[in-house]
Amino acid sequence: MRAIRTMFRTGPPRWRVAILDRDCSSRALLRAAVEDAGGLVAVEAPLRLDAIVVMKETGPDVVILAPSLGGSHEPALMPRITAELDCPAVLFTRDTDRSVVKQANRAGVMGFMLKPLRAAELGPTLDLALARFRELRRLQQARADRPFVDQAKGRLMSDRQLSEAEAFRWLRRQAMDSRQRLGDVAREVLAAESVLQSVPEGAR
């Protein structure tokens, strides 16, 4: 049934997944579950640091990390792997020790699946990990944009005699009309003002 569903699937995959697990049988189970859920396995490899190179080339949407109980060095690789990749990670393990959970949290892992694999849980777990990751990125971007938005509001308030609320509404409306992020519109406002100030007053 899995082969039939994979063969006749149309459109893009639900996600492109990297599986890092040194256990071949475990990788096979994960691959089957990913494909059954409408996903595509872009990378399969043991959980090693050199897998980062391959994953960067393929650009998965999400990576499943499966450290083995005998691989004492593998949990230590998780922070390095998650730091290098611009995608969420999900931990697949039978180890429920609190120290492992804390280590995974510090590494930025966005989801957990316990062995043995329950295939029905894989889809919702990957979807939730992606949603959490995107929200985190949105908040990080908003934090980075805030100084530029504040400066642009101040410039609009000064140049156009607007209140702070009016200046913010103007920026937001421009962002919606141009389908740009608010921070990008703010940067454009500041860049335009910088260009204007560089022009001699008599030439304006």
Model-derived regions: residue spans:
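C-terminal output helix
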Residues: 99, 117-126
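Non-catalytic signal-transmission and effector/linker regions of two-component phosphorelay proteins
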Residues: 1-16
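A short, hydrophobic beta-strand element within the central beta-sheet of small alpha/beta folds
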Residues: 63, 87-96
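Conserved phosphotransfer microenvironments
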Residues: 27, 48-52, 61-81
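C-terminal output/effector regions of signal-responsive regulators
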Residues: 141-204
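Conserved acidic segment of CheY-like receiver
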Residues: 13-25, 30-34, 63
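Short hydrophobic/Thr-rich beta-strand motif most characteristic of the beta2 strand and flanking loop
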Residues: 38-46, 54
